[in-house]
């Protein structure tokens, strides 16, 4: 409370000049409530790894919540519209039917939008157009490596029922969650999954993590997948080759629901009764 505004500004400037987001600034001064130049004061050290104990449990004065301040500075909340929520755009793709192809197409579209995009799928681990690892990377370890990479600005991660049961998802929430199918129950006996109905509890994981401002993209041609729609915290987009499916018609009629389907050989995005041909 006693720090002079000019002293605080000089400390911030010193950290910026060195290129640090968080720094400890050691100063020599007779009175911290006065500008340094009026008392011959100076900065003697810029510390990249400052200790917090002296602020949390000071010998003199009130404790300061520096840990909370650091976290809020590095990962600002979007609740007050002052910055991003500390998340990158993330698309999760779950299933077995052409999921690698879907993941690669989505990653390519994100790349074209200007994001440095990471992709973990059955075809390998990719950073933008570069193949980093040419093995099956549709698993937790590869996805975690991707999310730890500071250069990645958007990510697409493929999963299936086996990886979800074995490891879970590598992320807590996603902007878009795609579920293509619920195949493969015959391979999951080791996880005590024997019946097709049990697949709902497994594959709903991908829908459960969709953010409120995000969307679940579900295959309307498979009733068990389409039935996951009420579980999404965000919007729901249904897709199928046949746009006349009853589930799509019902979804479009309810709250202007969105759906993607093929009509007269063209891909159509429908919002309620309105239809827009994509690619035109």
Can you say where each PLM-predicted feature lies in the sequence?
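Residue-level signal for inorganic ion chemistry
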Residues: 26, 120, 158, 217
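Protein kinase-like catalytic core scaffold
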Residues: 42-44, 155, 178, 216
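Hydrophobic anchor at the start of a short beta-strand
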Residues: 116-118, 154, 216, 236
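Conserved nucleotide-sensing/catalytic segment adjacent to the nucleotide-binding pocket
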Residues: 130-167, 179
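Acidic, Mg2+-coordinating active-site environments of NTP-dependent enzymes
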Residues: 87, 166-172, 176-280
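ATP-dependent carboxylate activation and anion-phosphoryl transfer catalytic cores
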Residues: 1-92
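Flexible beta-alpha connector loops of hexameric P-loop NTPases
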Residues: 129-136, 188-194
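Walker A (P-loop) phosphate-binding motif
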Residues: 78-131
């Amino acid at each position: 409370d006693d720090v002079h505004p000019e002293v605080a500004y000089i400390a911030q400037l010193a950290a910026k000049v060195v290129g640090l987001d968080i720094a400890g600034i050691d100063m020599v001064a007779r009175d911290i409530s006065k500008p340094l130049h009026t008392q011959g004061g100076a900065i003697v050290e810029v510390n990249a790894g400052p200790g917090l104990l002296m602020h949390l449990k000071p010998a003199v004065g009130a404790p300061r919540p520096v840990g909370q301040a650091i976290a809020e500075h590095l990962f600002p909340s979007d609740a007050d519209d002052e910055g991003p929520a500390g998340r990158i755009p993330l698309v999760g793709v779950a299933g077995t039917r052409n999921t690698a192809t879907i993941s690669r197409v989505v990653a390519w579209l994100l790349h074209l939008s200007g994001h440095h995009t990471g992709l973990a799928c059955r075809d390998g681990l990719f950073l933008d157009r570069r193949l980093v690892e040419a093995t099956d990377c549709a698993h937790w370890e590869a996805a975690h490596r991707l999310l730890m990479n500071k250069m990645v600005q958007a990510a697409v991660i493929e999963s299936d029922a086996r990886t979800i049961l074995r490891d879970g998802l590598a992320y807590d929430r996603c902007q878009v969650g795609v579920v293509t199918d619920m195949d493969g129950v015959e391979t999951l006996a080791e996880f005590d999954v024997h019946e097709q109905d049990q697949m709902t509890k497994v594959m709903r994981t991908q829908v459960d993590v969709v953010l409120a401002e995000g969307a679940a993209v579900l295959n309307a041609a498979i009733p068990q997948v389409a039935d996951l729609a009420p579980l999404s915290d965000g919007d729901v987009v249904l897709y199928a080759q046949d746009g006349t499916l009853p589930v799509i018609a019902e979804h479009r009629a309810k709250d202007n629901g969105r759906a993607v389907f093929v009509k007269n050989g063209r891909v159509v995005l429908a919002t309620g009764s309105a239809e827009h041909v994509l690619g035109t």
